[in-house]
Amino acid sequence: MEANAGSTLAPVNYSDDNVAKPLENQPVNFYSLTLEDLKAYIKSKGKEQFRAQQIFKWVYEQRVTDPEQMTNLSKEFRQDLPSMLSFDLPPVLQHLKSVDGTQKFLFDMKDGMSVEAVVIPSEDRLTLCISSEVGCNMACKFCFTGKQKLKRRLRTEDIVGQFMQVHDRLAEGQRITNIVFMGMGEPLDNPEAVFKTIDVIHSPWGINLSRKKITVSTSGIVPEMWRVADAKVRLAVSLNGPNDEIRSQVMPINKRWDTKALLEACKEHYRVSKDKITFEYVLLKGITDQLEHARQLVKLVKDVPCKINIIPFNEHPGSGYERPDDDTIQAFHTELMNLGAHVLLRRSMGRDIFAACGQLTTVKERPQTMDISNSRLAGLPKYKRELLAAQEAEQNNQH
């Protein structure tokens, strides 16, 4: 799909801060490179280009990064490789496991920054929810990450590195089957690194994951949405409001690209890709959860082949929003189904370790050390006890 400079889908120009820029005569991070990048780099060093496929296979298929173990490389090349390439990965600062099987990883970006990624299990898949930025510029009101201003966009090696570190910590027999760019940050605010990462993830010489198993989620950066169809991956859109008034209230991006522009881009995506769009809709008590909102939502998206994921709000310290009660959630779900919508009520996974949708942040969480024995909290659901304990800890840290 090519961008038309006169359409709403024309691309935005970004300064390329996503490519590794090593000091002169310093090795390049291997995970910053696609196969074609590595071929060109090796050629520039006077080496045979076919060595790139060999190295990719060693690293991504065999998980070997020690040049001395890459036995089909010449001795001379193995000796030269450490001066050409580094295989550094972002260290794992914290690895938490939920009672429901969800796992959360906190990564050190080595510059004082950190990001999180989440592994979500289900019957037939194991999904990695991956981050694309430290913080986020979108400032969605209900999102914990949105409270943090964008600190920096992740580079390709930062994103690929999340996958590699998670993969190497999975239980025997487990493997990542799906990847969703739904972690910290707005993927289409960092398109160069995100779509370069997708090239590595999809490459048969790389991670070798089908493009149909990769989903890019956006809050609605309309001029960049053409890239998702161009990459032949799936599109998810954070809608979260049944009309412009409510969506603008909870998602400031709607003031720049309203629902009309957003849905036109969605229709264009379907025209090119023939893939249904997934609309994500967070239920906020008293704001987006009424039956009239359900009716408005169905009317809003009626011309876009789609499915709707309903996500009951996951509370976090200082959010100012509440999760609707179960009866309200079920009534909203039923109303959508009665109106003929293809709808899924998403189960919130990992709430006890603050790994659910909208709860990711850049600091170590406290669930391992939270004191929830206080009798005042004892009668509450576990996730609510931990939320209140986290809020108290946050307040104590501010004093």
Swiss-Prot record:
InterPro entries: Aldolase_TIM, Elp3/MiaA/NifB-like_rSAM, Methyltransferase_A, RlmN_N, RNA_MTrfase_RlmN, rRNA_lsu_MTrfase_RlmN/Cfr, rSAM. Keywords: 4Fe-4S, Cytoplasm, Disulfide bond, Iron, Iron-sulfur, Metal-binding, Methyltransferase, rRNA processing, S-adenosyl-L-methionine, Transferase, tRNA processing. Its main location: cytoplasm. It comes from the Bacteria. This is Dual-specificity RNA methyltransferase RlmN. SUPFAM superfamilies: Radical SAM enzymes. It catalyses: adenosine(2503) in 23S rRNA + 2 reduced [2Fe-2S]-[ferredoxin] + 2 S-adenosyl-L-methionine = 2-methyladenosine(2503) in 23S rRNA + 5'-deoxyadenosine + L-methionine + 2 oxidized [2Fe-2S]-[ferredoxin] + S-adenosyl-L-homocysteine; adenosine(37) in tRNA + 2 reduced [2Fe-2S]-[ferredoxin] + 2 S-adenosyl-L-methionine = 2-methyladenosine(37) in tRNA + 5'-deoxyadenosine + L-methionine + 2 oxidized [2Fe-2S]-[ferredoxin] + S-adenosyl-L-homocysteine. It comes from Bdellovibrio bacteriovorus (strain ATCC 15356 / DSM 50701 / NCIMB 9529 / HD100).
